[in-house]
From Swiss-Prot:
Forms part of the ribosomal stalk, playing a central role in the interaction of the ribosome with GTP-bound translation factors. This is Large ribosomal subunit protein uL10. Coiled coil: none annotated. One of its GO terms (cellular component) is large ribosomal subunit. One of its GO terms (biological process) is translation. GO terms for molecular function: large ribosomal subunit rRNA binding; structural constituent of ribosome. The keyword Ribonucleoprotein applies. Gene3D superfamilies: 3.30.70.1730, 6.10.250.290. It holds the Pfam family Ribosomal_L10. Belongs to the universal ribosomal protein uL10 family. The keyword rRNA-binding applies. Part of the ribosomal stalk of the 50S ribosomal subunit. The N-terminus interacts with L11 and the large rRNA to form the base of the stalk. The C-terminus forms an elongated spine to which L12 dimers bind in a sequential fashion forming a multimeric L10(L12)X complex. InterPro entries: Ribosomal_uL10, Ribosomal_uL10-like_sf, Ribosomal_uL10_bac, Ribosomal_uL10_bac_type, Ribosomal_uL10_CS_bac. The lineage of its organism: Bacteria, Pseudomonadati, Pseudomonadota, Alphaproteobacteria, Rickettsiales.
Length: 169
């Protein structure tokens, strides 16, 4: 990389750090081009990204954005995965890492909190924001459905009693 290109590259990483509340730092040593392309496509469909970064430039960008605490995570062939939705991204990366042993999760940052590999794996087990919204809607609708059922039960029972009485006569 030319010296004149480095400030632009640092700027790109700074923008990712500023615009993405969730970042996972990975080691991609041993992944094939097709595997990286597959991961990128999967991430892109979920409005996330995968960027191979030069460690020194990623460290400079981290210091410029006040994320000094993640600078020590950059060593070896490193790539960052970034997204606005942390759970979906974590699920995708953890599942990809399980199926492709050459992708290693090193750590990350979610809402300015540094996470280790274990924390990211635990994050991937949580329900996504959309799943939580669906559960809340279901919980709000469930009582009303039960109330309707309870209110209808006496009239149905009364109708059965009357029908039974009418059939006897």
């Amino acid at each position: 990389m030319l010296r004149s290109e480095k400030p632009v590259a640092v700027g790109d990483v700074v923008n990712i750090y500023k615009e993405s509340p969730s970042i996972i730092i990975t080691r991609y040593h041993g992944l094939t081009v097709s595997q990286v392309s597959s991961l990128r496509e999967s991430l892109k469909s979920r409005e996330a990204g995968f960027k191979v970064v030069k460690n020194t430039l990623a460290k400079i960008a981290a210091k410029q954005t006040g994320l000094d605490s993640i600078a020590n995570l950059f060593a070896g062939p490193t790539a960052i995965v970034y997204s606005k939705e942390p759970v979906e991204m974590a699920k995708l990366v953890v599942n990809f890492a399980k199926s492709n042993g050459n992708l290693k999760i090193v750590g990350g940052i979610v809402d300015n909190r540094v996470l280790d590999e274990y924390s990211i794996k635990e994050l991937s087990k949580l329900p996504s924001l959309n799943e939580l919204r669906g559960k809340i809607v279901w919980l709000l609708q469930a009582p009303s459905t039960k109330v309707v059922g309870v209110l209808q039960a006496p009239s149905v029972s009364m109708a059965r009693v009357l029908q039974a009485h009418a059939s006897k006569n």
